[in-house]
Amino acid sequence: MAKKIKQIAIYGKGGIGKSTTTSNISAALSIAGYKVMQFGCDPKSDSTNTLRGGEYIPTVLDTLRDSHSVKAQDVIFEGFNGIYCVEAGGPAPGVGCAGRGIITSVSLLKQQRVFEELDLDFVIYDVLGDVVCGGFAVPVREGIAEHVYTVTSADFMAIYAANNLFKGIQKYSREGGALLGGVIANSINAPYAKEIVDDFVKRTDTQVVEYVPRSVTVTQSELQGKTTIEAAPQSEQAKVYQRLAQRIAEHTESKVPAPLDTHELRQWAADWGKQLVALESGLIAPAAAGNL
């Protein structure tokens, strides 16, 4: 009987730390003995940089444009600790759909049965989450990914993007699409950031998988073109990523989230804005945050 490959999609708005988080998860899983492929699904094509010493790799779409026929070995590159790295790429500037690279790349690798031939344990898709449409929705819509995670902070636009993803998961769940594994709360250092994220996941019937603090260790590692797992394996930040990777590896039950509608989300955000003003001015006690 063929081994079941665990396919995971990690979404998040641009700049939220999605690729940093994904690469450290991949690195931690590989250190734990799993065979991993990281599949970059962002037109910037930089998902796998820190797995390859800061180097960019040729993308699937660029390779197709140059040769019109592509073999898997032309677009799969080995990174840190044997992690297989793929970048879908995007169209030429001003031309076509940015999500098209995902559709083309996934089809190419599936046709050539690459996942089975490499005997992978995990395929992790790193997907731009500002919009959940067209090609960017493929891992969710087609059920390619079994479990979906979203990286968010307490910033409104990050939460807005997460809520939009929840809407997409809810819609496609009726057609066999992927379900939500949980929320990865990133950069949780600011006052009340944890409380804001906790309140959001409670209201959307989801869960936080891990709280990832902002850390200078991550910055130092990325300046070297490395993940924290590679550059600072004994650091406290590395332990956070290792714990997150273990939870993802052990996770089996995903669910359909309950997204807020646009009015509910705006009202929720406005209520939190008022609470933060009251907290800062001492009108309410910190323990009351999120309970008003």
Model-derived regions: residue spans:
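Walker A/P-loop phosphate-binding motif and the immediately C-terminal alpha-helix
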Residues: 3-43
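Conserved beta-strand scaffold positions in the cores of enzyme catalytic domains, especially
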Residues: 7, 38, 83-85, 208-211
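Residue-level signature of catalytic and energy-coupling elements of molecular machines
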Residues: 14, 86, 105, 126, ...
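N-terminal phosphate/diphosphate-binding loop that engages ATP/GTP or pyrophosphate donors
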Residues: 28-88
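Short, glycine/acidic-enriched loop or turn micro-motifs at the edges of active sites
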Residues: 43-45, 90, 129, 189
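Flexible beta-alpha connector loops of hexameric P-loop NTPases
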Residues: 90-100, 156-157
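Conserved catalytic-core segment of NTP-binding enzymes
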Residues: 111, 115-122, 127-214, 219-220
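C-terminal lobe/tail of nucleotide-utilizing enzymes
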Residues: 171-292
